[in-house]
Amino acid sequence: MIENPIKRRPTRKIRVGSVYVGGDAPISIQSMTNTETCDVDATVAQIQRCADAGVDIMRVSVPSMEAAEAFGKIRQRVSVPLVADIHFDHRIALAVADYGADCLRINPGNIGSDQKVREVVAAARHHGISIRIGVNAGSLEKDLQKKYGEPTGAALLESAMRHIDILDRLDFHEFKVSVKASNVFLTMDAYRLLSQQIDNPLHLGVTEAGIYRTGTVKSAIALGGLLMEGIGDTMRISLAAEPEDEVKIGFDILKSLGLRSNGINFIACPSCSRQEFNVIKVMQALEERLEDIRTPMDLSVIGCKVNGPGEAKEADIGIVGASPRSLVYRNGEKSHLIDTDQLVDEIEDMVRQRVKEIEEAKSKEIIRSSS
């Protein structure tokens, strides 16, 4: 087993509801609703779908006082920590703090006067909630646009440090920071520069990354690269897609880097003429059937005996394709044969049984350690 070479950057630990961000806390996955916030039922349903996908933190846009009231109703109906996304009107921030927001996403620079910022910080302090400073390349201050000519890593850093200085002067330190851009290199440059200046947790993201496929690729490159350098404490994959898809992709990135496990790590061959069954159809069916599982485990499904045994030995459950019967490996050892035309049903049964065994072992360990 190759040792994971990633060493995370030391950061402060803050809290977003029941979820810790930074320090030794696991890298958390976030998403954001795209429903009308005032449509409480639709927003709650979307948050629940993200919760089912494993999301740690959800962000909800609150553009008006009417939306703030709706936010309060949403807060009562979901258990996932909620970040209220607020711009321009500090009164909305004060309202959602009263309604139970777990974090306020603001730019201190567009909330208004120093007095208004002080009121928002006082409300956050009173309610024990955190703040996220969100800097975006598309909304840089005009003087920085003039100074740098275009969005640059240095420009994003300077904007972030301005906002950080405001909170520092108010002796408020329960905050995380993001410096997002839609360009991969600009995003990475900005976060690298920021990570050298502060020890606050960093919220990673490529803003307006694009539609599902291209946005996934851009996010995987930028955020994966930063994570490999130890930069990042929480992340959102911003896609023109369903929020629950953002969650799944976020976990896939973390799983691929060995930083966090959530559900099944599927290992499958791309298939070729050697395959003894239709690998693509089998994997599509398994992914759909097993998407409810959150217990970490490795499942290897290889269509022939060329690479199948080697991959199977490294997985919790491994399948080596053959006809009419395929070979099953359990925990790296040969186990038994199964009918190849019954693969999907057989694999699902084995996975669910393995999940049961893992969870029972965890429960016994908890009982032993607490006795």
UniProtKB/Swiss-Prot annotation:
Question: What residue range is the signal peptide?
Answer: none
Q: Which GO terms describe its molecular function?
A: 4 iron, 4 sulfur cluster binding; 4-hydroxy-3-methylbut-2-en-1-yl diphosphate synthase activity (ferredoxin); 4-hydroxy-3-methylbut-2-enyl-diphosphate synthase activity (flavodoxin); iron ion binding
Alphabetical GO biological process terms: isopentenyl diphosphate biosynthetic process, methylerythritol 4-phosphate pathway; terpenoid biosynthetic process
State if Nucleus is listed as a keyword.
no
Q: How is the cofactor bound?
A: Binds 1 [4Fe-4S] cluster.
Give the enzyme class: oxidoreductase
Q: Under which pathway is this protein filed?
A: Isoprenoid biosynthesis; isopentenyl diphosphate biosynthesis via DXP pathway; isopentenyl diphosphate from 1-deoxy-D-xylulose 5-phosphate: step 5/6
Residues annotated to bind [4Fe-4S] cluster: 269, 272, 304, 311
Catalytic activity, EC: 1.17.7.3
Q: Which cofactor does it need?
A: [4Fe-4S] cluster
| Catalyzed chemical reaction(s) | (2E)-4-hydroxy-3-methylbut-2-enyl diphosphate + oxidized [flavodoxin] + H2O + 2 H(+) = 2-C-methyl-D-erythritol 2,4-cyclic diphosphate + reduced [flavodoxin]
Q: Provide the alphabetized UniProt keywords.
A: 4Fe-4S, Iron, Iron-sulfur, Isoprene biosynthesis, Metal-binding, Oxidoreductase
Q: Mind telling me which NCBIfam families this protein's record contains?
A: ispG_gcpE, PRK00366.1
Biological role stated in the UniProt entry: Converts 2C-methyl-D-erythritol 2,4-cyclodiphosphate (ME-2,4cPP) into 1-hydroxy-2-methyl-2-(E)-butenyl 4-diphosphate.
* Family to which this protein belongs: Belongs to the IspG family.
According to UniProt, the name of this protein is 4-hydroxy-3-methylbut-2-en-1-yl diphosphate synthase (flavodoxin)
Recorded source organism is: Acinetobacter baylyi (strain ATCC 33305 / BD413 / ADP1)
What is the organism lineage in this UniProt record?
A: Bacteria, Pseudomonadati, Pseudomonadota, Gammaproteobacteria, Moraxellales
